[in-house]
Regions:
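A short, highly charged nucleic-acid-interacting micro-segment common to nuclease
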Residues: 149-153, 179-198
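Catalytic core segments in nucleotide and nucleic-acid processing enzymes
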Residues: 187-344
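Short amphipathic alpha-helical segments at helix-loop
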Residues: 144, 182-183, 260
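Terminal, charged accessory segments of proteins
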Residues: 1-179
């Protein structure tokens, strides 16, 4: 089990806003589950946003009025017979806090009130909800989570990201159709967080490298590329023409068993080999080094991969990162990968 405190550190790299001074005290708090951690982040983040002021936008509103405002909705006025009362249905834009971002935050806070978090935290969230009295609750199943951000709403990006993790990583539907907030993120959400954490860690802690989630082009003999999938890397680290491609893996089992023998997951190995060989061919006319690594989140299995293979002229490594240790140990392992790959 990954300590909740380490999940906070992973989140702080995935969401750079969490490294601001306002959130520093969260690093020293003890959280008994991930739901409590997310609630604390939202609690702090919303409080900061309230000091700036809740975001506002022009929101369409329709109501019965005695004087014309905006556009007259004739058909609706006739249908509701408001004209008999010397009123009419008008549709206009209102500059309001009832925006979708605020609706997402309010709805997520209401979900957290049903979760296994402390009463103190619930009381704090209820106090914050008072500032959202003019904001509607929405069904988070139908939210478009990929909305663009601009200068006016940039401060919401981390808050909405945490709401997304709570809804998609902690909310679980029971057999009777009801929902329950789980204590810890599901495997799929932890996998995405693990990938994002690794990429952002290397971006921040190793600025001497270029760190990106780059695509690799298929090296084809002709122009036929129909139906070929994109080769999307998790992390590509480069320094000049020295390149390390890392494929981050967060599984319940790091190896597979075949007739009682542990082996690496075939698909994982085929994937990283394909990435490396296509990148190798792309740079064939330049002086370069391309290597690959499968970096598993370590489980409690007896077999822990720590292997390096030389395959057709390229180095492919398999490592395990122990997330169940003090974060300084995690950082040391990640830094050691750079030392061995770029400073030899």
């Amino acid at each position: 089990m990954i300590p909740v405190q380490n999940i906070y550190y992973m989140l702080s790299y995935a969401f750079q806003a969490l490294q601001a001074q306002n959130y520093k005290n969260l690093a020293t708090e003890n959280f008994h589950n991930t739901a409590e951690l997310c609630a604390a982040i939202l609690d702090k983040g919303i409080s900061i946003q309230l000091k700036r002021g809740l975001g506002r936008d022009y929101v369409p509103k329709s109501e019965s009025l005695s004087t014309l405002q905006g556009k007259l909705n004739i058909s609706e006025s006739i249908k509701t017979q408001t004209l008999l009362k010397k009123q009419m249905i008008c549709t206009y834009d209102e500059f309001s806090t009832n925006t979708q971002f605020n609706q997402i935050i309010k709805s997520t806070m209401l979900l957290l009130l049903k979760s296994n978090i402390t009463n103190t935290r619930k009381k704090s969230l209820r106090n914050l909800l008072l500032f959202f009295s003019d904001v509607n609750e929405i069904d988070l199943r139908f939210v478009n989570w990929n909305q663009p951000y601009n200068r006016s709403n940039q401060s919401y990006q981390m808050l909405i990201g945490i709401c997304y993790l709570i809804y998609n990583g902690l909310l679980q539907t029971q057999n009777d159709g009801t929902t329950k907030i789980m204590d810890f993120f599901d495997e799929q959400r932890m996998c995405r967080l693990y990938e994002k954490f690794l990429l952002e860690y290397y971006r921040k802690e190793h600025p001497e490298l270029s760190a990106n989630a780059s695509q690799i082009a298929w090296q084809l003999d002709d122009s036929e590329n129909q139906l070929l999938p994109k080769m999307q890397t998790d992390i590509m680290l480069s320094q000049g023409n020295n390149i390390l491609i890392i494929d981050a893996k967060y599984y319940s089992h790091m190896t597979q068993q075949h007739y009682g023998t542990n082996t690496l997951h075939s698909n994982n190995l085929y994937q990283i080999f394909t990435y490396v060989k296509n990148k190798e061919f792309e740079l064939r006319k330049l002086e370069h080094t391309v290597s690959g690594m499968l970096l598993y989140a370590q489980t409690d299995e007896n077999v822990i991969p720590n292997n390096t293979y030389q395959m057709s002229g390229n180095q492919i490594s398999v490592r395990a990162l122990n997330l169940n240790q003090d974060f300084s140990g995690i950082a040391h392992t990640l830094d050691d990968i750079i030392q061995n790959s770029f400073n030899n």
